Regions:
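Flexible, surface-exposed loop regions and adjacent strand-edge segments
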Residues: 29-39, 87-92, 128-137
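Intrinsically disordered, low-complexity peptide-like regions
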Residues: 36, 71, 95-96, 116
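Generic, ordered loop/turn and secondary-structure boundary motif
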Residues: 45, 95-97, 120-121
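C-terminal beta-signal and adjacent terminal beta-strands/loops
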Residues: 76-83, 103-166
Length: 166
């Protein structure tokens, strides 16, 4: 189930947005891993049960010919397994917060932007798996989760940006 909302409020320039998703992603068929496990009936990898976001933007005139926009968003993800095995390692649930401030010309030719992403510096696993070329000294599931490598999203970032459109 998914739902999206975009509300143009009665306050000029203020918009509110939100998204919500509920998922019950389960391996319904036979799926045999390299370690011999059948994942049938287990939770799918990288599939949080609940995810969503909430944000607001405010856009207004600053001076003759110039406008500003302030925007902030908070995104939530429930915990999820990041391996392809039964009882795989899990990424804990998390919140990510972003903010931006823009000063731009009404004709759209110039814009100055300050963008902050992942302000809480939340390090989140986005993918993971066995390290290629490693030979385990054990067998079964424990061998599969011995030597794992993960990819994470970026931590806190700030960007100062200028755009010019011809």
């Amino acid at each position: 189930f998914e739902a999206d909302v975009l509300w143009y409020t009665e306050i000029p320039g203020l918009t509110v947005r939100g998204q919500f998703a509920w998922s019950d992603a389960t391996n319904t068929g036979d799926f045999i891993t390299p370690g011999g496990e059948n994942l049938k009936g287990s939770e799918r990898s990288y599939s949080p049960e609940i995810a969503g976001s909430f944000g607001i933007s405010y856009d207004a005139s600053l001076t003759d010919g110039w406008r500003y926009n302030f925007s902030t968003d908070a995104r939530y993800s429930d915990d999820y397994g990041w391996g392809v095995y039964i009882d795989s390692p899990r990424q804990d649930s998390f919140w990510i917060n972003d903010v931006s401030l823009s000063l731009y010309s009404e004709d759209g030719q110039h814009s100055f932007n300050l963008i902050g992403r992942n302000l809480g510096d939340e390090i989140v696993i986005v993918t993971g798996g066995a390290v290629p070329g490693r030979i385990s000294t054990q067998t079964g599931t424990s061998a599969l989760i011995q030597d794992q490598a993960v990819t994470t999203q970026q931590g806190r970032t700030f960007t100062l940006q200028y755009k010019y459109k011809m």
